[in-house]
A protein has these predicted regions:
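Contiguous, glycine/small-aliphatic-enriched amphipathic segments in soluble metabolic enzymes
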Residues: 1-143
Length: 144
């Protein structure tokens, strides 16, 4: 956890890989940030926004010891299946949940000070056979 003299570290899950989350996250580098952001994502998703591949590939890998203001890092979490923007695939439901799980685990362990979640598609997670009513209920169950 951060102290008043330290910079907070925020875990940002990129959500449904076929959705808007990876695109929103690709807009972060270069913005003025008063925190350190750790993007939890498959690196290949971050570069799919036209013209952003070079900049996103240049983002550093997550380093727990780094505490630079405005730093955006990537904690690579591999996709379960190939992904195309706008095409939902139940095979990636576990990927979406693994992003949430990693962020929750990091928050509970004090590795991250907070987490922000990009949209997840409830229907495709349910189609994969995983009961899911939303982020709030999932996080509440994980945190007890």
């Amino acid at each position: 956890m951060s102290t008043p003299s330290q910079l907070p570290t925020v875990a940002l899950t990129t959500g449904e890989p076929a959705g808007i989350g990876p695109d929103l996250c690709a807009a972060l580098p270069g913005r003025r940030l008063n925190c350190r952001v750790v993007l939890l994502a498959d690196r290949s998703l971050l570069g799919r926004v036209r013209g952003e591949r070079r900049r996103m590939n240049a983002l550093p890998d997550y380093d727990p010891a780094a505490r630079a203001r405005g730093r955006v890092e990537v904690l690579h979490v591999p996709l379960a299946a190939a992904c195309r923007a706008g095409r939902l695939d139940p095979a990636n439901a576990r990927y979406v949940l693994s992003l949430l799980d990693r962020a929750v685990d990091g928050c509970l362990a004090g590795e991250f000070d907070a987490m922000v979640t990009a949209p997840a598609h409830k229907g495709v997670i349910n189609d994969a056979g995983v009961p899911f009513t939303g982020h709030t209920e999932y996080l509440a169950a994980r945190c007890g």
